[in-house]
Amino acid sequence: MPIRHCIVHLIDKKPDGSPAVLHARDSELAASDAIENLLADLNDSYNAKQGKAWGFFHGESGAYPLSGWLKQYLDEEKDFTAFSRVAVEHLQKLMEESNLSTGGHILFAHYQQGMTEYLAIALLHHSEGVAVNAQLDVTPSRHLDLGQLHLAARINLSEWKNNQNSRQYISFIKGKNGKKVSDYFRDFIGCQEGVDGPGETRTLLKAFSDFVESEDLPEESAREKTQTLVEYATTQTKLGEPVTLEELSSLIDEDRPKAFYDHIRNKDYGLSPEIPADKRTLNQFRRFTGRAEGLSISFEAHLLGDKVEYDEAAGTLIIKGLPTTLVDQLKRRKD
């Protein structure tokens, strides 16, 4: 993962309304194994975070100046240090306006993964721990706690430069503690949400369920295709990459690689060619299966409590919205 530029600044602020004090670094960090490891760990932690949102820049203005400064840097009108300095000064002002905000180390990193260039911006905090030194004494130890990554954003610079119509070249972590805590960071980035990750994922899974039903697939085949979808989408989220519908379609049915893709387009689900999959929504899409005495039952986990009701005390399932093929068979048997 080539790192083009990297720098860290410190904003010292407590969540009590006190002023934010900036301690700015005046030069980039030199390349080192430690920086490589930090960026790799940061990427892993960021990709694993649930509840991210995707969007695009507001128009450049006094309220949202970051995109303009970033463009100046990419056009070589500013160097990376100058860009990061003016950006962190703006973040300092926004922090002072948000009483609940807490300071920390602000990391700016311009790096490349594959053929794609990214800018990562993250607010990092330390955790207190212990270590054993060379004299075998137990001593206090401070380390960056990437597991507690709450405010961070990643800008796909290649997508921003090459696709003017994209609405998902920025991803950012949505705060869990309410609007007041995290909105200042989103305003700092100047991002507006353009893609509903959980909603797009639910639509994808609905399209897949409809596809499986329309194909009238055997239980084993349906289970294998479901597993393929979940594994591919989960892998993409871990890599921080979107789900590509054409690639997914070819994995689901190697003999008919366009079948699922054509189903999505023909039914007009409104899905983009690439969608940011939501990990939490994917985890609800596992299948429950069971066989006993000539009975075979298989359904997707997200249907539990909706089309499928389980009564644990009675040991029964109530299934609503039966497949039309099954209803027809039952009617013929009755007649």
From Swiss-Prot:
Keyword Cytoplasm annotated: yes
Keywords: Cytoplasm
Cellular component, GO annotation: bacterial nucleoid; cytoplasm
Superkingdom of the organism of origin: Bacteria
GO molecular function: double-stranded DNA binding; single-stranded RNA binding
Protein localization: Cytoplasm, Nucleoid
Keyword Cytoplasm: yes
Pfam families reported in the protein's UniProt record: NA37
InterPro entries for this protein: Nucleoid_associated_NdpA
UniProt family annotation: Belongs to the YejK family.
HAMAP family recorded: NdpA
The protein's name: Nucleoid-associated protein PP_0973
Organism whose genome encodes this protein: Pseudomonas putida (strain ATCC 47054 / DSM 6125 / CFBP 8728 / NCIMB 11950 / KT2440)
